[in-house]
């Protein structure tokens, strides 16, 4: 998907009923996905919700796998307004694994997120793989964003997935552990984008995905 239309392609499916605050394709030729809250404080009518995994994250934008063996590559710019906002790509199912960049201070951490038995309340683990300096920074005084341009890739073969990344779109480096795909509930495994924040204060960040391409 080149995201050159303001209509989202029919191959894409949200992980829950759509909320317009999650994002949409833009007239600038990219898909914008805003970071969504992973934790929710208690209110007068609801209890606090603590984070365990992305199983309950409704704003995952996913599509079904196109073949047994394939490579999917995304070109994106991640913009962060606050610490602990992150975005990237994910292979989603009852077990899942994601490759994301997370803002910490004035740098970005490349991280592997992994969860086993997410549907049963399994807790997510995080592994830091690399550290990057921002590609660009806002100069505005109010709530400036820092940006990272990155290419992310997943290679699937015989039921296993290997993630990789590149900063120039030419030289890719393997990232994290090989992951065995597992189906979702009532559906097969799905792949796509993740954009979240664990700090619910301050302004949201976002992913601008230029394209998501699949090759066989």
Q: What positions do the PLM features span?
A:
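Extracellular glycan-recognition regions
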Residues: 1-216
């Amino acid at each position: 998907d080149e995201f050159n239309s303001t209509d989202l392609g029919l191959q894409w499916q949200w992980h829950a009923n759509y909320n317009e605050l999650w994002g949409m394709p833009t007239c600038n030729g990219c898909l914008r996905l805003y970071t969504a809250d992973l934790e929710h404080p208690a209110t007068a009518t609801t209890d606090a919700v603590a984070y365990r995994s992305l199983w309950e994250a409704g704003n995952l934008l996913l599509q079904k796998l196109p073949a047994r063996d394939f490579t999917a590559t995304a070109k994106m710019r991640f913009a962060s307004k606050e610490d602990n906002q992150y975005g990237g790509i994910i292979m989603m199912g009852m077990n899942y694994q994601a490759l994301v960049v997370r803002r910490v201070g004035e740098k970005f951490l490349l991280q592997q997120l992994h969860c086993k038995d997410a549907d049963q309340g399994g807790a997510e683990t995080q592994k830091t793989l690399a550290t990057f300096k921002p590609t660009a920074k806002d100069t505005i005084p109010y709530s400036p964003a820092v940006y990272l341009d990155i290419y992310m890739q997943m290679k699937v073969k015989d039921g296993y997935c290997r993630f990789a990344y590149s900063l120039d779109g030419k030289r890719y480096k393997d990232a994290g552990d090989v992951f065995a795909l597992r189906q979702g509930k009532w559906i097969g495994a799905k792949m796509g984008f993740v954009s979240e924040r664990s700090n619910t204060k301050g302004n949201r960040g976002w992913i601008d995905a230029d394209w998501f391409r699949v090759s066989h």
